[in-house]
Amino acid sequence: MKVEIEDVLFWMDAIRNSEDRYRTLESFWKGQVRSKVWLSDQLNNWYIGLKDIVIFGGWNGVLASILFNVRPDIKSITSVDIDPTCEEIANTVNKRYEMEGKFKAVTADMCNYKYNAHLVINTSCEHITQQQYETWLSNIPEQAMIVLQSNDYFELDEHIRCATDLEDFVEMSKINVTWKAELQTEKYKRFMLIGQKIMD
């Protein structure tokens, strides 16, 4: 994967201007970046026609920037995170696309956020309870494609809903799964599902 040098410079601006540089740098840890590149590669391999994307648990906006580099035909990405410190950082990381009107970072609770999208991504499934997840799932537009990621990294206190393995993640995710896989990183396994809502 190639990243535009202008985007890399904006990444450095985001880190340099951040009040908590170490926390911002966590977005660029090897496991974090590998998981996001893995996701973008899979979408690029088989899902055509990415238009409007909403990323929940968007954190500092690195996934959005990677997706724009892999798929320049993307119309828009909205990155939603409940942490208010993420919004300015994410807008800086994606400054080129923000200036073009293609990117927006939003501070909001994913359980209450209303939207329309062709593709919905949540790479932070381990950070929310099952009840929060199911509330969030119920708000997803019916025809949207869904991409979910979680892991088996139970050691972090903020990881309150990890999966023991890929099948455990499938079971707790409650979607019609069309693709599933796992990625071994240095410290944990990353799980990913692609699918759609189960319709009543």
List where the protein language model places each region.
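Conserved class I S-adenosyl-L-methionine
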Residues: 48-60
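Conserved SAM-binding loop of SAM-dependent methyltransferases across substrates and taxa
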Residues: 60-73
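A short SAM/SAH-binding and catalytic strip from SAM-dependent methyltransferases
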Residues: 116-132
